[in-house]
Amino acid sequence: MRGSLDWNMENQKSYALITGASSGMGLEYARQMAAKGYNILVVSNRDEDNVKVAESLKAEFGVDAQPFYADLSKTEASQAVFDWTVEKGYRVDVLISNAGLLVFNKLENIPAAKMDLIIGVHCLATAHLCRLFGSQMKERAVALSRQRTEEAIAAGAKPGSRKAKRAGKLRKGECGRILIMSSLAAYLPYPTISIYSATKAFSKAFGTAIWVELRDWGISVTTVCPSAVDTPLIGLKPSLRKLAHNLGVMIYPQTLVKKALRAMFHGKRIVVPTLLAKIAVGFCSILPMHCVSWIAHIPVIKKNVYDAV
């Protein structure tokens, strides 16, 4: 693959690449990762905001932060992001696939272009980025495992022995971490956000599948399935936001990101970050679909709200 990197290239800085990092939850991921000392790659389709966020991260946290414009709904964008990191020598040790958008409307009222946008960002971009950076992480893992095995053999271990195999075994997350933002909607085909729900179900299934593929190579994959998050993605009046928080339906992005990162650094496969969301997951598995038809009649659901990537 283009841009494969040796594990011990000392001229490379380690970075966390975050999509949708110019605002909302992505910005919070960038801030909390920077607070942990990670250099940040700010990727979104908001060029000026990318630059502002990168500069603010440098000033506040003393880390390196670099902006990159990418419209992730375009099929070539993921490759462009990857090629940029290779060209600049940025070693991506953490990939956070966070970019997203939301449309509340019945299917017949959603423009085809908007459908393509949601599917492109949530499904294709996530899959392509994980393929590119996951493969790169695995190449480094193979090199590191081989190096440790050879060192063990040089120290007296027999080739193929348990001691040699143990030496080459990689720890969880040692060679890279991937975090994929899914949603509680992945567990329930949700009326008026049918495309969103379907794409988030893809994210959840995809994340679980590549968790299996990559875990033996010291690469952790964590899929996050929150309920509603208090970001501009959801267009609610302040009074309704307050009610949603009081009912435990909505979570602040700072709280969600803190829980998601804790799960990622512990190598968790799936994280459902609130008690109410965990209970909802259980109900979703047994709830007859005709019981959720009332959702389409909630006034706020009738409003067409969307946010750029």
Language-model-derived ranges and their functions:
Residues 27, 212-276:
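SDR active-site lid
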Residues 130, 199:
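Active-site helix of classical SDR
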Residues 183:
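Residue(s) in the substrate-gating loop at a strand-loop-helix junction
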Residues 69-80, 112:
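The beta1-alpha1 cofactor-binding region of Rossmann-like NAD(H)/NADP(H)-dependent oxidoreductases
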Residues 15, 22-23:
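Conserved glycine-rich cofactor-binding loop
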Residues 36-52:
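Conserved glycine-rich Rossmann-like NAD(P)H-binding loop of the short-chain dehydrogenase/reductase
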Residues 106-107, 111-119:
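Substrate-binding pocket helix/loop in short-chain dehydrogenase/reductase
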